[in-house]
Amino acid sequence: VIPICISTVNGKGLPVLLESIKQYAPEAFVYLRGTERVVSGYKNARLIFGEPRNFGEDYNEIIDDALKYAQACIVCNDDVVLTPNSYQRLLEDVEVIRELEINVGWVGARSDYVRPAQNIRYNPDGDHLEMCRFKSEQFIRHANNIAPIFAYISRDAWHHGRFPPLNWFSDDVSCADLNNQGYQHFVSSAYVHHVGSQTTGDDSKQLVAASVPWVKEHRPQYVKHFFGS
């Protein structure tokens, strides 16, 4: 059974997220990181207490812990809500992709608040709606970048693509590092609802600017691609 890894700052969305896991993926063990004040009441999870630092460092800690025991995990934002088949569909798609005998990096669910490649509003083929969704939503799609709001990663891939100590662009760095080592990323046909912007806020200029110094120092080869200059 593949565990689910969650790190939280204020825990605002946790009750709904954890209830959706309980109802729709009760077999999945949950690893949860946050302050003792926020997460200590959740007894049916492995808890790691810690003050919030940034997305990358906080998730590195909880994922590293899970992958001591599991061969893979699902990285999950603290403000998503599963549907009845989110967990099962994601893992079914992973098995399909693994049959291609390639190095699999991130495999991420679709959502309503996420980057274009995973966004259910993204309709590059101009599909018509069928039963309230685009036909393309049922297919697995290759992607250069995955936002891990609900995303699978194997232990092997993780050790080649851990997050940097950033909020924004932590996923960009992980995906690019893995791409450069021959891993490929995919969008699953699975779906989760995502509230979004509950922790870092929605000041995109400030969030981008905060990431630039680290990327310039540690991944200068990505600067033009990430920031356009």
Residues of each region from the PLM?
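Short beta-strand-to-loop acidic/aromatic patch adjacent to the donor-nucleotide binding site
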Residues: A70-V81
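Conserved donor-nucleotide/metal-binding helix-loop-beta segment in metal-dependent transferases, i.e.
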Residues: Y87-G105
